[in-house]
Amino acid sequence: TVQTNNVNTEETRAISATEVSQTTALELEQTTQTQELTELVTEEGTIWNQQKAKQLGQYMETWGQERNQNYQAYQPGHSVAFYTIQVPDDLLSYEPKIQPAIGNNPIWLNWSETGSEGGYCLVAVYSDSATQVAQKHVYLFTLVNGEAKVYVSKEQPAEEQPYLFLKETSNTELKEQFTNLVNNL
C-alpha cells in the first residue's frame, strides 16, 4: 500500500505539473496574442507605420526605375553621403550639423516611426546619391501637423552656409502617392 501511495502521489505530481505547464503555456499564448493584436491596432491607428513604410519603399523602387535612378532608403544610424553631409544623421537634433531650411527658413526635423510627434516629422528618406555621379537627389518624406509633404534637395550644401536647402517636390505623382499612403487611400 505504501508503494501504491507513492506511485499515486508521483502520478498526481506529474499530472499537476503537466496541467500547470499546459495552463501556463495557454496563458502565455493568450498574452502573446493579445500583445500582438494591441501592437497591430496601435500601429494601424497611427498616421505612419511599418506597413506604409514598406509600401513607400516598393513604390520608390518602381518610381526610380522609371527614371533610370536607384533610390535607397535611409534612416538614423544608416545615412547616405549626400555630397559633403550624411543624411539623415547630420540633419536631426536640436543642433544639427547642418540646418535644413525651406527657402530661407530653418526647420527642425524629428525622426518619427509614427508621424505623430509635432513639428516636422521625418518618416522616410530616399536618395540616389550612392549610385549617381552627377545630379544627386535626396527626398525627405515628412508629416507636418499630419499633412504629407515631400521635400527634395539636389544641391550640394555651400561650405560658407550651414544649410541644406529644401523645396517641396514638384513631382505631382510622388506627392500624391505619399499623401495617399498617409491617408490610407
Question: Which residues does each PLM region occupy?
Answer:
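Aromatic-enriched hydrophobic runs in primary sequence
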Residues: 32-34, 38-44, 53, 67-68, ...
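N-terminal, intrinsically disordered, polar/charged segments of Gram-positive cell-envelope systems
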Residues: 1-66
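Mature extracytoplasmic domains of secretory-pathway proteins
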Residues: 58, 64-137
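Extracytoplasmic electrostatic interaction patches
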Residues: 105-185
